[in-house]
Amino acid sequence: MSLPAKKAIEIDENITHYIYKMLSHESILKYDETKCVECGFCHRVCPVTISIYDEPLKRTAIGTPKEMRIESDKKIVVDTEKCIWCGSCTWICPGYTLELLINGENKILLVENGSLAEFDEEVRTLENGHKVRKVVHGSIKFNCNEKDTKVIDKFTEECAVDAMSREGNDIAVDIDKCILCFKCSEASKNYDNISVDIHRDQFMKVKGNPSSVWNGIMLRVLGKEGKIKGIMSRSQNKLADSVMRLLGKESIEEE
């Protein structure tokens, strides 16, 4: 095997290891399908943005198969050619779905060197026994003009953390359970008479003074729409370059 080497290994039907092996160390991004709540946070915080035909950058190194344009029946897939194993997705993941191992040790270098902040979190256990954490403060509002209660019930079931319920012809949310993710707002696009307005105002109490990389990544999470922001050049990616430097790597490998 020539080094460095990148590959994906399916351990079983639910567990996938995304491996980056070099002479001095091995990084493994572990993904557990059973824990994924399809929140969309990993796709937003990934610092790697890929230019597609010189259009605004919307694709990162991790996301749903549709977002990644990769054929798969998994909820989330990783582009091993673009992933830099920085751990940003692990750092934000509310469902503990992703885990980064460096030489067998669970660690995120960007947190250890102070580039990404540690923050308070609210953790609870779902009915299926899996844990989920809330990492951002904000608000959520539904605009429901749907008359068919069966359609409303179907929409409330889109929530993977049991935070939504139907009250008559309206949608109620338990804000203590809601993790203010992107799942229901994305799902609402498939419902003609339901829309969602989410504001992610700030992270839980932040510890320390993180670097400018923090500011760049926060642009991808906070705000009304949580749009991915990047530059529009096929050859440059300033945020990813900054992350690579903080990880002690010179540049992103090109295909």
How would you describe each model-predicted region?
Residues 1-27, 54, 59-75, 80-255:
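Flanking helices and flexible, charged tails adjoining ferredoxin-like Fe-S electron-transfer domains
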Residues 27-28, 38-41:
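Histidine- and aromatic-rich ligand-binding microenvironments
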Residues 31-35:
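Local sequence-structure signature of Cys/Sec-based thiol-disulfide redox active-site neighborhoods
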Residues 36-38, 151:
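Acidic, low-complexity mobile loops and tails
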Residues 40, 44-45, 49-56:
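Short, contiguous, helix-prone interaction/anchoring segments in small proteins
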